[in-house]
Swiss-Prot record:
HAMAP family: GTPase_EngB (MF_00321). Necessary for normal cell division and for the maintenance of normal septation. It comes from the Bacteria. GTP binds at residues 38-45, 64-68, 82-85, 149-152, 182-185. The gene is engB. Residues 30-204 form the EngB-type G domain. This is Probable GTP-binding protein EngB. Keywords: Cell cycle, Cell division, GTP-binding, Magnesium, Metal-binding, Nucleotide-binding, Septation. PROSITE patterns: G_ENGB.
Length: 213
């Protein structure tokens, strides 16, 4: 019998918990959280919705509409967090600065945060925002996994070449700790690999092994 990834059922039952403008409005800091970050228009909300098989994360034709930390409950101990998108020119500078302060406070203080999924548009990877997130994750010892989103926008060969190029750049600058994969929400490409990362961070891998038959 083929194993069913243990995180899949939890993601499919994900429900919205709350939105927080600052850290003291977040849920109790216990259990397991995985946060999703990405520059505006990197496909973050689409990736979250595909992973949860639902329309949980807000999508918009205007990037940067997500201004809050949005928490989604998987079970009593596990949550996904949609972080504010950054970099869209139409967002006023004071609002960008407000987002940045509270994002830094969340990332720097959250004990339950077990890993960070960073979305990069495969056509425009390694932006200044991406480099800052990589620097922070490696310096703080936070596990990071990168989704090169919108991989369906390129031919498979071009997507694979970009993956190898970015992977090489990351290894040279940040070491082996950061992992990376191709991802496409509309084509459902890379789901199993992403689920495996989530299951490991949320300590569900052993439960998957128990289900083997």
């Amino acid at each position: 019998m083929q194993l069913k990834n243990p995180i899949l059922g939890l993601c499919q039952q994900a429900t919205f918990m709350l939105s927080a403008a600052k850290v003291d409005q977040c849920p109790d800091d216990e259990g397991f959280e995985v946060a999703f970050a990405g520059r505006s228009n990197a496909g973050k909300s689409s990736a979250l919705n595909t992973l949860t098989h639902a329309s949980l994360a807000r999508t918009s034709k205007t990037p940067g509409r997500t201004q809050l930390l949005n928490f989604f409950k998987l079970d009593d101990d596990r949550r996904l967090v949609d972080l504010p998108g950054y970099g869209y020119a139409k967002v006023p500078i004071p609002l960008k600065q407000h987002w940045q302060r509270h994002l830094e406070a969340y990332l720097g203080s959250r004990e339950s945060l077990k890993g960070l999924i960073l979305m990069m548009d495969i056509r425009h990877p390694m932006t200044d925002f991406d480099l800052l997130m990589l620097d922070w994750a490696v310096a703080s010892g936070m596990p990071m996994h990168i989704l090169l989103t919108k991989a369906d926008k390129l031919t498979y060969g071009a997507a694979k070449n970009t993956l190898l190029k970015v992977q090489s750049q990351i290894r040279k600058g940040w070491g082996e700790a950061v992992t990376i994969q191709l991802f496409s929400a509309p084509k459902r490409m890379g789901l199993e690999e992403a689920y495996t990362v989530l299951a490991g961070w949320m300590e569900l891998a052993d439960k998957g092994a128990e289900a083997e038959a």
